[in-house]
């Protein structure tokens, strides 16, 4: 396995571990101040419990090679909701954006086709060729 793939897998495992152990488990377990924190965000603890389950599912999908792309798309959507929630209540919102970027970078390092799609836009070859001739 190449060094690039190893780095991608290390980032992926660390990210999934963070999602499961630092984020989802906080939604699934009881702790002091949990209800107040979630109420500030506009969610009750029942909804947060369900979100924790979904978060674990997405983290697992992200780690399985056959479902990693869909898992990353779902993770991005989930983190978009987290970003919007934090913006709405005036909390710092950069963390979910950084996590989403790390997820896409990790997936791209694991599977170079992800970066290829982003850079080469394979489904718009004519448009890309026109843009390339204009810039030269």
Identify the role of each PLM range.
Residues 43-63:
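Core segments of alpha-helical transmembrane spans in multipass integral membrane proteins
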Residues 1-22, 64-136:
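Extended, low-polarity transmembrane helix blocks
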């Amino acid at each position: 396995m190449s060094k690039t793939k190893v780095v991608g897998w290390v980032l992926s495992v660390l990210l999934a571990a963070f999602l499961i152990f630092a984020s989802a488990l906080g939604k699934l377990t009881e702790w002091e101040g949990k209800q107040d924190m979630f109420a500030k965000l506009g969610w009750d603890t029942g909804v947060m419990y369900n979100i924790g389950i979904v978060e674990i599912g997405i983290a697992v999908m992200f780690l399985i090679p056959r479902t990693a792309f869909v898992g990353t798309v779902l993770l991005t959507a989930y983190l978009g909701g987290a970003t919007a929630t934090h913006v709405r209540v005036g909390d710092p919102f950069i963390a979910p954006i950084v996590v989403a970027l790390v997820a896409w970078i990790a997936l791209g390092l694991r599977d170079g086709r992800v970066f290829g799609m982003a850079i080469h836009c394979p489904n718009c070859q004519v448009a890309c060729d026109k843009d390339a001739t204009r810039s030269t």
